Amino acid sequence: MAAASVSETSASQFSNILAEPSKSNGSMVRHSSSPYVVYPPDKPFLNSDLRRSPNKPTFAYPESNSRAIFSALKNLQDKIRRLELERIQAEESVKTLSKETIEYKKVLDEQIPERENSKNEESKHNQELTSQLLAAENKCNLLEKQLEYMRNMIKHAEMERTSVLEKQVSLERERQHDQTHVQNQLEKLDLLEQEYNKLTTMQALAEKKMQELEAKLRQEEQERKRMQAKAAQLQTGLEVNRLIYEDKATSCVPNTKRIKKKKSKPPEKKGSRNYFAVQPHYRLCLGDMPFVAGKSTSPSHAVVANVQHVLHLMKQHSKVLCNDRVVSSIPLAKQVSSRTGKSKKSATPPSSSSVNEELSEVLQTLQDEFGQMSFDHQQLAKLIQESPTVELKDNLECELEALVGRMEAKANQITKVRKYQAQLEKQKLEKQKKELKATRKTLDEEGNSSSRSTTTGTTNKKDFAKPRPGEKSRKNLQLLKDMQSIQNSLQSNSLCWDY
């Protein structure tokens, strides 16, 4: 009976020891043949007995990755601690079981059949405990692997965070560098705009000056035309008055008085009787004057440029180089008549030689201007080839086209002047031929009229030797009209004279 009571007490203690770790693990383990029991239906969740501590805060919004990782790690650590406590309790229970088995061996040795049965039961319980221990160790290994994996994940996340921060810093630096570059470009653009504004203002001032100079040149050209027209009118009026006066004198005065006056007066020259000398004006032979290509005619500090300016004034018959009488545009005949109180006498009209000289001077100036234009054409072509930008190239091409148009106009002027020179030469040759024919006729008539008296012969010879008093003036007037017509044709509005 005592043995039976001892066995019952030992069995109850053994069942209590086995029940404690099973309760801590959250499952009911009974002393039966199967080690596991069905999960109780009154606990639908695994952690229904879990109570949250008030110190631990709860978050209504989803946690971030780092916080979720830390919370998972804490849960794993809690589980590991609980498993370790369970393992310790299991070891303690194993120790107690080993002690009890030693105590029970004495009793079991006495009872062999009961001992065999107890041995079988103990072996079964030991196998169950070893299996539980192996399962706990496997769980611990898995948890350790999970911890290592989580540590690696945390390291990888930190490395990614540092790389992202470095990329942000590099992007910020690049953005600052781009901002500085853009600022420099904007400053350069501001400087270029200021320079462009300066150039536009300078160009506007230069255009205004050019317009003023062109207006002055037009005024001077108009004044020169008016003076030429006035001079032509005065010359024609004086010539008509002289012819009327000579006709009246020849009709009123008898022949005897005229013969006596001729005998008493000394012999005078043909041109000195009725004409005054031409106004003293500085005439320049343009063929002897040099032309320096590429030099400006405006006044400058350079000696060569000043010489070029003086040559330009001399070629254009500037009033600066003339005396006061010429500048005041008063004819010499009027000054002489005012001083002496004599009757009005006109100046001689320009001869064919003076017209030829003026035409040669005009032709020389036109050729010089054409040479200057050709030199400018070469310079513009070089600049177009060396131009760095397209806008500058287009502007230079426009200037080149305008220069080509002016060169064509200048070439037309040169051809017109040359044609007029050729016409004058033809007229001169025709006049010489007519004069030769007239002299031959006079010689034939003198041979036939040898019976005439000496006085009548001398008068006839003089009359035949010199032309009629109206013919020479008519020829000179015709030459003057031709010269004025060619000047008007050359100074038309369709053409521009470049000085």
Curated annotation (Swiss-Prot):
Using the record's annotations, give every residue carrying the modification Phosphoserine. Answer: S53
Polar residues composition bias: residue spans: 1-35
The record's subcellular location field reads:
Nucleus; Cytoplasm; Cytoplasm, Cytoskeleton, Microtubule organizing center, Centrosome
Return the annotated region ranges for centrosome localization domain (CLD): 58-239
Please give the function described in this protein's UniProt entry: Centrosomal protein which may be required for microtubule attachment to centrosomes. May act by forming ring-like structures around microtubules. Mediates nuclear translocation and mitogenic activity of the internalized growth factor FGF2.
What free text does the record give on domains?
The C-terminal region mediates the interaction with microtubules and is able to nucleate and bundles microtubules in vitro. The centrosome localization domain (CLD) region mediates the localization to centrosomes and homooligomerization.
- What is the official name of this protein in its record? Centrosomal protein of 57 kDa
Taxonomic source organism: Bos taurus (Bovine)
